[in-house]
């Protein structure tokens, strides 16, 4: 029979050796800790602001002039400098002050790419060490408080399955530090798929104030076939799958304000032969693409002299035309597709 001693050792003894047997119900006084966060009493309308250098901080006025109804702006200010967890920051207090004067909160973005590190292995090197996580978190909080920032938006996109547990622990630790300092905390995520479950949306939702689903990149640069960046079905599935793990009041779906112009040409026999036995061989056309903003995309369609028509499957306006020895295809993001 399996037994345990009073000081916690577990083992087995023969049943016929037991004496003075009595049954007792053991209860635990353990109470699961409750994590309180920051919840806004309004709908979050957030825009990421890609800021690559300190000079670009001065463009906030121009950026806001072309927007409306925003509540939150998220400049890409924080990057991991090295595998020791040091921080590169281009945070700007004047930027924050201008945003506040425009009735906007500033949630600075912390990224694991486009900085000193730029690979899954390097991200793992940082997150797999408690001391390096702590170093990074302390520097992020200090920089945020110095600039008067209102929140942190975590955008780590180079997480491997091996790094999953360490990443989630980092989310826990950063969340606690943010809340201790009055900072809102949100986390960006890919559309949930079976291959990225290690991002652990359910555990994120315990600690993060908001969980953001990046509802785009259905087809990306390097895809084997042309397609929409964010078709209706893709976005809908992403939201519904996220809601299985995240409370609806914490979920934010991010939409693209860009699309891709695709160019297809038939593969030659030589190209098909070279790809034999690979996934690429299943696709008869060679495909390249260029990312375009909404206005530039509509301009390209007009310049081609074609009329886009509504595609019910993707719920987007679609156009294609032949030129330059191949076929151009584009699924537009416009006011109709965003409704």
Region roles according to the model:
Residues 3, 154, 253:
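Terminal peptide-recognition signature
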Residues 57-58, 191-220, 258-290:
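Substrate-binding cleft/loops of secretory-pathway carbohydrate-active enzymes
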Residues 28-31, 259-338:
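Glycan-binding loop/region signatures in secreted carbohydrate-active enzymes
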Residues 39-54, 64-67, 79-232:
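Chitinase-like catalytic core of GlcNAc-active glycosidases
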Residues 15-61:
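Boundary/entry segment of secreted carbohydrate-active catalytic domains
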Residues 85-104, 224-252, 256, 291-317:
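Glycoside hydrolase catalytic-domain groove-lining segments
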Residues 1-16:
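SH3/SH3-like beta-barrel superfamily modules
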